[in-house]
Amino acid sequence: MSIYTNSKPWTVPALAEAKRNGSKIVMLTAYDAGFARILDANGVDLILVGDSLGMVVQGHDSTLPVSVHDMVYHTACVARGVRHAMLVVDLPFQADASPERALEAATALLRVGAQMIKIEGAGHKLEVISYLVEREIPVCSHLGLTPQSVLRFGGYKVQGRGEEAGGRLRAEARAAVEAGATLLLLECVPSQLAAQITTDASVPTIGIGAGAGCDGQVLVLHDLLGLDSGHPRPKFVKDFLAHGGSVAGAVRAYANAVRDGSFPDVEHTYTS
């Protein structure tokens, strides 16, 4: 049985209200209308059209080959299946290399149904965040492990371990909020650090491999369903379809587990 009762469309003010009320936010990825309908009807608050499609849909080894054209196409598909969830969309690799370039890409995505734009990283990306927010475009700031930086990181590794690295990530989160970010997404971050950032931040945090202390959780849909992407399965992934049932049932089980705090548990969490 689902504990999901909200049928109102999700908005930026609704995110802020969830943070104030301590209501957990449920997020999943989708890349087409069919799966988007299932997510939308089974307790998912935010749907992410992630550039992860480069790996789980297109078969690449990273997200780097994904283009703005790809993101526009898949965003348009997903938008046709959504009635209640908020649609968050990635700017792909180098689409945010300058504020002007980011605005052009974001505008194309908003025109086909995006409601919030996700940008990876901090540093010079803060200028991009401010530039978009000043032009009335909601932004999610993705911090911690940012897959578009995989070449610099030397692989997919936990970020923020140790006092210096943790302090740097907390500073990046504060700067992103000051730049106008409406939402923070924390990936592969020690749970203690993610909880500190969540307490500090005036906006909601969504975790993926960042522990239960975040204001919400996200997973890649293919991971949640146990589909083989040809890549090693991260520690934070749980197969909600492992014991049978339907896709809709797996999505409901995930949504309920996020809301009641049973996912992620220690098994699916990184520590310092």
UniProtKB/Swiss-Prot annotation:
State any single GO MF term.
magnesium ion binding
Which pathway features in its UniProt record? Cofactor biosynthesis; (R)-pantothenate biosynthesis; (R)-pantoate from 3-methyl-2-oxobutanoate: step 1/2
Binding-site positions, Mg(2+): D51, D90, E120
- Identify its protein family: Belongs to the PanB family.
According to its record, what are the GO cellular component terms?
cytoplasm
Per the UniProt entry, the Enzyme Commission number(s) are: 2.1.2.11
Cell compartments where the protein resides: Cytoplasm
So where's the catalytic machinery, residue-wise? E187
Identify the keywords attached in UniProt to this record, alphabetized. Cytoplasm, Magnesium, Metal-binding, Pantothenate biosynthesis, Transferase
Q: Give the residue range of the signal peptide.
A: none
Q: Does the keyword Transferase apply?
A: yes
Per the UniProt entry, what is one GO biological process? pantothenate biosynthetic process
* Residue numbers binding 3-methyl-2-oxobutanoate: D51, S52, D90, K118
Provide the reaction this enzyme catalyses: 3-methyl-2-oxobutanoate + (6R)-5,10-methylene-5,6,7,8-tetrahydrofolate + H2O = 2-dehydropantoate + (6S)-5,6,7,8-tetrahydrofolate
Organism listed in the record:
Xylella fastidiosa (strain Temecula1 / ATCC 700964)
Cofactor(s) the protein requires to work: Mg(2+)
Protein name, per record:
3-methyl-2-oxobutanoate hydroxymethyltransferase
- What is the role of the protein in this entry? Catalyzes the reversible reaction in which hydroxymethyl group from 5,10-methylenetetrahydrofolate is transferred onto alpha-ketoisovalerate to form ketopantoate.
Please describe the quaternary structure of this protein: Homodecamer; pentamer of dimers.
The free-text cofactor remark is: Binds 1 Mg(2+) ion per subunit.
CDD domains given in the database record = KPHMT-like
Superkingdom is: Bacteria
